[in-house]
Amino acid sequence: MKKKILLTCLFVFAIFLSSWLTRNYISDSDFKKLPESVKMAFYIEKYSILYNIPKNIAYGVPYYETSYRGTNDTNYNPKRISKHKAYGAMQIKLATANGISDTTITKKELLNNTELNVILSYKLLKKLYDKYGNWKLAVGAYNTGKPIVNKYAKLVCKFDLKKIDNSENIISYAVKD
């Protein structure tokens, strides 16, 4: 039994190492030539591991936000702007991006830099998960805004909002009270 577990772990590590090495051996110019859907899958895999985002959430958010359907999605266009002024592959608002980033982010960067868009998205999702303690509320807050999720959590889930630092303004810009 221990051998099976060890072999499985080694196999998973070998796959991870292989994908990491493959990316490192592809030149930046060759990587830029890849279809957007392939680059998006790479970013999802890389940053979901870094921020400990479950795969169903990691792929579900771009599926919902910009209709991402995987590496074979030949029509995928991550450069979208919503009617609510959310930008790029993961539909991040500028105020959110600047609230969770260490540097000032521009609309152009959010729209044209898919990697940055994914990083900021997963960083936000991780913060929301740490705050709410469950992925359902974290994804709800990501999608609809903190005030609505706080109301839902208080009324429906009997969630202890006293544990939440209400002075934190991660996404309160999303929905005006």
What spans do the regions from the language model cover?
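Positively charged n-region of N-terminal signal peptides that target proteins for export
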Residues: M1-K4
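Hydrophobic membrane-insertion alpha-helices, especially the h-region
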Residues: L7-S19
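Catalytic glycan-binding domains that act on GlcNAc-containing polysaccharides
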Residues: R23-D177
